[in-house]
Amino acid sequence: MIGANDVLKFSSLLAEEMAALVRRVQSSLVLVRGRRYGAGAGIIWDSDGLILTNNHVVGRQTPFVLLGDDREFEARLVARDPEIDLALLQIPAQDLPAASIADSNHLKVGELVFALGHPWGQRGYVTRGVVSALSQAQTSGKRGRIPIIRTDAPLAPGNSGGPLVNAAGAVIGINTLIVGGDQGVAIPSYLASEFVASSGFAKHFVKEREPAEAII
């Protein structure tokens, strides 16, 4: 028979495990200064200095990347895709703590997720939510529509480009925008992997999922 003490012990162990997972993801979280005003987030995609972020975070300015250990580097823009709002940067650093990338094809509505970023300039904040919907968004580019992840994990300016991670601490999306004040939108990790692969940096790659039916 399971008693109240057993439940409390299990809850405590689960909380400790989740906190440890989040700390590991935070080590791969960076701050990206690309626009004249403000900053966004990004993730270390590859240990050799590849940084993935949002295209709108980079803007037209020379981007700078601030690592979790407070080292800052001027970054080189190696690829960008405004339609899916992603940009790939390279910094002159090695042996970095790269993020673990999950296959967003297996993501389910209702799944627990965490959003990491620097809301309002506060570094390394974590918020929690669930996957609200797996849908598509219309674009003005050649794709016409792109898959998106909608979540109720609270986002704010400074979260853009940061990771959306699952309960295992692996990245399943890149936080991109806020809709209606209470819904976040993220680009799925498989689409991010395709973007990186098309740029010639293909260490992480997952297959495309079937298009979702819901359209926003």
Stretches found by the model and what they are:
Residues 1-2, 37, 46-86, 91-94, ...:
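Catalytic-histidine neighborhood of serine endopeptidases
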Residues 12-20, 28-48, 71-74, 100, ...:
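A conserved glycine-rich beta-strand in the N-terminal activation segment of trypsin-fold
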Residues 20-21, 43, 76-78, 94-123, ...:
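Active-site substrate-binding loop(s) of clan PA
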Residues 1-22, 75, 115, 119, ...:
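C-terminal cap/linker of serine protease catalytic domains
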Residues 35, 54-56, 112, 118-119, ...:
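Short, surface-exposed secondary-structure boundary micro-motifs
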Residues 45-46, 57-59, 101, 107, ...:
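Short, well-ordered loop/turn sites that connect or cap secondary structure elements
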Residues 26-28, 87, 91-100, 125-203, ...:
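Active-site region of chymotrypsin-like
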Residues 60-77, 94, 108-114, 123-137, ...:
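Beta-strand/loop subdomains of soluble extracytoplasmic proteins
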